[in-house]
Curated annotation (Swiss-Prot):
<feature type="binding site">
    <location>
        <position position="503"/>
    </location>
    <ligand>
        <name>Fe cation</name>
    </ligand>
</feature>
<keyword id="KW-0503">Monooxygenase</keyword>
<comment type="similarity">
    <text>Belongs to the carotenoid oxygenase family.</text>
</comment>
<dbReference type="GO" id="GO:0004497">
    <property type="term" value="F:monooxygenase activity"/>
</dbReference>
<dbReference type="GO" id="GO:0046872">
    <property type="term" value="F:metal ion binding"/>
</dbReference>
<dbReference type="InterPro" id="IPR000595">
    <property type="entry name" value="cNMP-bd_dom"/>
</dbReference>
<keyword id="KW-0560">Oxidoreductase</keyword>
<feature type="binding site">
    <location>
        <position position="312"/>
    </location>
    <ligand>
        <name>Fe cation</name>
    </ligand>
</feature>
<keyword id="KW-0408">Iron</keyword>
<protein>
    <recommendedName>
        <fullName>Carotenoid isomerooxygenase</fullName>
        <ecNumber>1.13.11.65</ecNumber>
    </recommendedName>
</protein>
<dbReference type="InterPro" id="IPR004294">
    <property type="entry name" value="Carotenoid_Oase"/>
</dbReference>
<dbReference type="GO" id="GO:0003834">
    <property type="term" value="F:beta-carotene 15,15'-dioxygenase activity"/>
</dbReference>
<dbReference type="GO" id="GO:0106422">
    <property type="term" value="F:carotenoid isomerooxygenase activity"/>
</dbReference>
<comment type="function">
    <text>Catalyzes the oxidative cleavage at the 15,15'-double bond of carotenoids and the simultaneous all-trans to 11-cis isomerization of one cleavage product. Carotenoids like 11-cis retinal can promote visual pigment biogenesis in the dark. Essential for the biosynthesis of the 3-hydroxyretinal chromophore of rhodopsin from zeaxanthin and for proper photoreceptor development.</text>
</comment>
<dbReference type="Pfam" id="PF03055">
    <property type="entry name" value="RPE65"/>
</dbReference>
<dbReference type="GO" id="GO:0042574">
    <property type="term" value="P:retinal metabolic process"/>
</dbReference>
<dbReference type="GO" id="GO:0042572">
    <property type="term" value="P:retinol metabolic process"/>
</dbReference>
Amino acid sequence: MAVHQEKLYPNCDSGVWLRSCEEEVTEPLEGTITGEIPSWLQGSLLRNGPGSLKVGSMRFEHLFDSSALLHRFAINDGSVTYQCRFLQSNTFKKNRAAERIVVTEFGTRAVPDPCHTIFDRVAALFKPGESLSDNAMISLYPFGDEIYAFTEGPVIHRIDPETLDTLERRNLMDSVSLVNHTSHPHVMPNGDVYNLGMSIVQGRLKHVIVKFPYTEKGDMFAKAHIVANMSPRWPLHPAYMHTFGITENYFVIVEQPLSVSLLTMVKSQPSNEPLASSLHWYPNHETHIVLLSRRDGKEVKRYRTEPLFYLHIINAYEHDGVLVVDLCAYKDAKAIDAMYINAIETMQSNADYAEWFRGRPKRLELPLNATNCSRIEPRLLAQLGCETPRIHYDLYNGRPYRYFYAISSDVDAANPGTIIKVDTKTGETKTWCDTNCYPSEPIFVPAPGATEEDDGVILSALVWGGAGAHCRRVALLVLEARGLRELARATFCAPSPVPKCLHGWFLPRRTQL
């Protein structure tokens, strides 16, 4: 007789991350509306994230390896439609054609390709845009009137924001020789885009800031150029960074003690080892916060703080001689291990799993007149696990702000599927949740003519725990941003399971193609 094992986290259904979409939704589905969508809310919420863990009889080993699935919620005069399509990356097409995993991913080793010799694999080190996976399953960002899907490799993909077709593949090695970049560039009010990456500058590997100048006509990528650079703290172990900050006068680089070992990468290339094997956490080394001048691109000052791991910076700004950096911080990098598929499947029997994801929003206050390498102690902003944070981006990115919105990262919470609003001034928090419901990154959309920072709505994609019809259910949630009161939702029944998504972008109707 089978012994029933008690779940350590009975309120958390990890299955929402383990689903694989089996059928795309190319023709828009009409949603069932409850409540009332504000009449001014018109446009599309575009989402990106893991879509399928399966290729033939094989399975990916890490969540970041899952085939990219694009989602669209189109809002039009109070009604909403839903679509989803797989990103047609080279990696996706090669895997589907072979019916097996033939391109090594972040955490998954591909099957050997008999056509590739050891010399081919060594040569691949010098052309990462073509040899590495281009499975851009993390985020979506606008470059002018075009939308691109991002991962951390140098290849991005332009998508059609209405059909979700994959239109174009761009290798940034061709324009600014980026060997990698973050999944979260900054889009400025004038349309310029900045991103942090790595490039060879005067024969040395550097962390660089690249500017893509906005142009109404022409190619933003053709005019891309490096505007700032800094040497890694450890030349052969550059820090892994998923985001960066930008303020009025500075680019803000948080150099955490999680590094990518270049030597391990070189050694592992012939054996086809995944990138994750090159990541190393150094618990006895501090985190450095580096300020690069937006005027001349040079390093101005650096600060030290406790060892911490982060994926997302919430915001950064200057005020009264202090530069403030808010971020979602963890004590170590176990959160990456927690996203291995085996770890997700066995979490209910892993007493340490909740601690792996025990992140908290913290604030670093950097006096601009401090001596170089001053030590800064972080300050807790809220006693809640917060991830995929968003702010009123258009008006408050890089400027003094008060509110941010996030989803819970506490798997042992009473309801892990919670949307959180944090008041950084008072420490007050507001939450929204529903039974067995798992929201995605909450995106703030300002109301027309808004004068208050939180005058607008929050949009979030919802999925539900469970099997059968539950795993095919997906919805768009609309919350009033001030109090997180539910205004409306549009619910759909997809033809196959809908996995939980990661990041996205809202396109108001006026900016759509």
